[in-house]
């Protein structure tokens, strides 16, 4: 189960039950507080006084996205900071948004941000940078992609009937050509060939080449960047982080606490998200060193087996090549974007927070990232994005909160309330905050507070949690409540005993050309069952009043161990491990589970045993 253990709460011999006093400080209609009341037992007055005091600290108060979306004027910036203070906020993320008239990253922009930092500091509030013009992080408003080598790239698959060789035109940036025999949409056999004349009669010519992302107005006439390319990432850091450092680097780690990275991704896998061109569903991520790195890590040549990446082979829904491909992409993203970014920030005193692109379903994680939990490992305060109201993706904050517990991270962020609309009441804001707090969210980033609602800005993810809303003078009650709640949780350890092996790696191997619809919907029955089991298992556990964390197999391989009857990931130990719905499991995970069970740990396999180990089919 889940128990909240209060650190240092019994420093004296005073054993009076102060639970009701605590509940009078924080309203009782919150599930987390009832959990606290019935699990903690006795709480001393010293602890309660500390909670009241801590609840007033900016550290525990929300920091909204301050949508800087017009012509910035210092008097108006100062006025709005005062409004934030009155609304109970503890600072703000300084965020360029649609409608910005001041030149992004220009001298005036930098002066205005420095002014905001100083004004926030005068009021005892925190400043947090945001690393992009709108989103996603990496382009500096598109300018990084002016250099063509930095642009997002994809492998493209083209299928044609040209067995006589006359209709084939070798594309620019050619990779490989195959003669392929299909049975419907499944591979029967394939052979790499050197020319179209070698295509066997009755078979298809399947050609692979790579292409740059097409320019887009969203990126100011350029593209997203190749986040798998370390040189592109260096250019991004130089264009943004280094510029901020030169302007006000002496404030890093002091007045300026950290920086928000938003919707980082490595490009879409078979779903065309953000691409939008006619071939987008035929595309998977590519970078210059892809084939070299793949062979180094997986010990075989991806070029020789590209058809198995795209198509189901020999009656199997699961592809070892697709499984390996997503794994290599994940490793390259971490090595070339995540780790260098975090290293730069650590060396310069900035906390890294934010969230990646699409965390909801397994398909979302697979198509745009691979493993969100592996990415969270390298964020100081891992975070999520929860759009809309009553968006009960309970397992998403649990993914970030699990990593935070396992690797000792102080806060877990949620970018919340975005596009929730103008009908939201204060009770609605509290309700959506409550369930996320119960799932481990301790750093609130309300989305969005408009600088102005002129022009296009008024259509940017309403409502505005700012003075444009009539209730803004009453909103402080919401934030006072949550700041005290977060102060409570900062003094607590959530003693979760149960671990669920996260099934995302099974989704990697079920990915294929034609396997996704409407971006994140899946077409194959086995993939649908995997998604359903993922949702149903966590929901069932929660409804039974039991808590559980998730364990990512990559993180288990890196930081897992069995010790004294507990299975540890990093610094968090578990008494019980649940394996449910997996199509594949790592051999390293199995070995650790065997060791854990031998020490007296409990391992529960729910439903069928995985059919694959390390992506290879089990034959006995």
Predicted regions and their residues:
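Extended, non-globular alpha-helical segments
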Residues: 81-84
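Short linear interaction motifs
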Residues: 237-243, 479
């Amino acid at each position: 189960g889940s128990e909240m253990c209060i650190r240092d709460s019994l420093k004296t011999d005073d054993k009076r039950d102060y639970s009701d006093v605590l509940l009078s400080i924080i309203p009782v209609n919150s599930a987390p507080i009832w959990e606290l009341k019935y699990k903690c037992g006795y709480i001393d007055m010293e602890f309660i006084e500390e909670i009241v005091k801590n609840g007033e600290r900016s550290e525990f108060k929300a920091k909204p996205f301050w949508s800087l979306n017009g012509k910035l004027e210092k008097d108006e910036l100062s006025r709005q900071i005062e409004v934030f203070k009155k609304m109970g906020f503890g600072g703000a993320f300084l965020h360029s948004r649609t409608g910005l008239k001041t030149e992004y990253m220009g001298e005036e922009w930098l002066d205005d941000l420095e002014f905001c930092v100083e004004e926030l500091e005068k009021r005892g509030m925190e400043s947090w940078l945001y690393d992009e013009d709108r989103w996603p992080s990496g382009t500096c408003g598109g300018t990084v992609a002016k250099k063509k080598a930095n642009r997002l790239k994809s492998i493209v698959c083209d299928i044609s009937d040209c067995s006589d060789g006359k209709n084939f035109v070798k594309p620019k940036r050619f990779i490989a050509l195959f003669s392929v025999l299909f049975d419907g949409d499944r591979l029967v056999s394939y052979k790499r060939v050197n020319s179209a004349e070698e295509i066997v009669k009755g078979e298809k010519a399947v050609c692979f080449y790579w292409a740059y992302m097409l320019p887009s107005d969203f990126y100011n006439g350029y593209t997203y960047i190749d986040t798998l390319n370390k040189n592109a990432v260096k250019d991004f850091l130089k264009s943004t982080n280094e510029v901020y450092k030169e302007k006000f680097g002496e404030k890093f780690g002091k007045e300026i606490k950290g920086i928000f990275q938003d919707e980082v991704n490595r490009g879409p896998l078979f779903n065309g998200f953000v691409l939008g061109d006619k071939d987008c569903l035929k595309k998977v991520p590519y970078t210059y060193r892809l084939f070299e790195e793949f062979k180094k890590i997986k010990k075989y040549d991806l070029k020789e087996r590209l058809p198995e990446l795209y198509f189901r082979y020999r009656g199997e829904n699961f592809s070892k090549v697709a499984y390996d491909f997503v794994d290599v992409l994940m490793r390259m993203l971490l090595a070339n974007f995540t780790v260098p970014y975090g290293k730069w920030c650590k060396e310069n005193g900035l906390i890294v927070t934010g969230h990646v692109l699409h965390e909801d379903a397994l398909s979302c994680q697979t198509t745009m990232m691979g493993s969100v939990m592996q990415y969270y490992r390298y964020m100081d305060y891992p975070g999520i994005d929860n759009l809309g109201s009553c968006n009960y993706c309970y397992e998403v904050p649990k993914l970030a909160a699990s990593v935070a517990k396992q690797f000792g991270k102080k806060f877990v962020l949620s970018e919340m309330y975005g596009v929730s609309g103008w009908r939201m009441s204060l009770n609605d804001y509290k309700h959506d905050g409550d369930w996320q707090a119960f799932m481990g969210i301790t750093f609130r980033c309300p989305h969005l507070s408009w600088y102005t609602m002129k022009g296009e800005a008024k259509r940017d993810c309403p409502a505005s949690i700012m003075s444009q809303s009539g209730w803004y003078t009453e909103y402080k009650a919401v934030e006072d409540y949550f700041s005290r709640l977060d102060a409570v949780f900062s003094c607590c350890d959530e003693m979760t005993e149960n671990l669920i092996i996260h099934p995302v790696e099974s989704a990697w191997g079920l990915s294929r050309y034609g396997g996704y619809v409407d971006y994140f919907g899946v077409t194959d029955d086995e993939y649908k069952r995997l998604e359903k089991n993922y949702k149903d298992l966590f929901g069932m556990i929660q409804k039974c009043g039991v808590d559980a964390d998730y364990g990512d197999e990559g993180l288990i391989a890196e930081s897992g161990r069995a010790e004294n009857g507990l299975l540890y990931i990093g610094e968090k130990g578990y008494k019980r491990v649940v394996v449910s719905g997996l199509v594949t499991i790592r051999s390293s995970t199995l070995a650790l589970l065997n060791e854990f069970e031998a020490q007296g740990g409990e391992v529960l396999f729910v439903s069928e045993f995985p059919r694959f180990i390390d992506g290879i089919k089990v034959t006995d």
